[in-house]
Amino acid sequence: MINDIKKDAQERMGKSIEALGRNLASIRTGRAHPSILDSVKVPAWGSDMPLNQVAAITVEDARTLKIVAHDKNLSAAIEKAILTSDLGLNPSSAGTTIRVPMPALTEETRKGYTKQASSVAEDAKVAVRNVRRDALADLKKLTKDKEISEDEERRAADEIQKLTDKFVAEIDAAFKAKEKDLLAV
């Protein structure tokens, strides 16, 4: 029972870290990275499709993304979708190839993105702490139902706290790395 609670807590905390990684990857750093365009939806074949499903996105150089539409008729729609997204990017097309230059970040936008990254990291910490709270509540319930002793509960609670501390440290490390990326000129 205790092992099930710990295993469940570890899995849920791991999912919080994965979500943090995805969220941090979508924050622009001034360098070209395909995940920047993950939020872009293109009207194609009767519905809004994620850009990465209707085109191949590659990094051409440090500051340019190259997009090749799978269907050449979608090039204009892809370009329009990128322009109307809130990413502040200006694509230029040449036939079926669309190039998206990454504008250099100003000091103000760097600080804004750093604040956004900090908020995302804080949300991940809250999620990890909520998992800890749930696990501790489950342990208390087992103790109340006399399925485990108070000593076992205390030992398991200490292990869950160590697990929480480990995941919070991972979150801090991921944020520090992103912050370093954002503030590098």
From Swiss-Prot:
One of its GO terms (molecular function) is ribosomal large subunit binding. This is Ribosome-recycling factor. PANTHER family: MITOCHONDRIAL RIBOSOME RECYCLING FACTOR PSEUDO 1, RIBOSOME RECYCLING FACTOR. Responsible for the release of ribosomes from messenger RNA at the termination of protein biosynthesis. May increase the efficiency of translation by recycling ribosomes from one round of translation to another. Keywords: Cytoplasm, Protein biosynthesis. The keyword Protein biosynthesis applies. Belongs to the RRF family. It comes from Pseudomonas entomophila (strain L48). GO terms for cellular component: cytosol. It comes from the Bacteria. GO terms for biological process: cytoplasmic translational termination. InterPro entries: Ribosome_recyc_fac, Ribosome_recyc_fac_dom, RRF_sf. It is found in: Cytoplasm. The keyword Amino-acid biosynthesis does not apply.
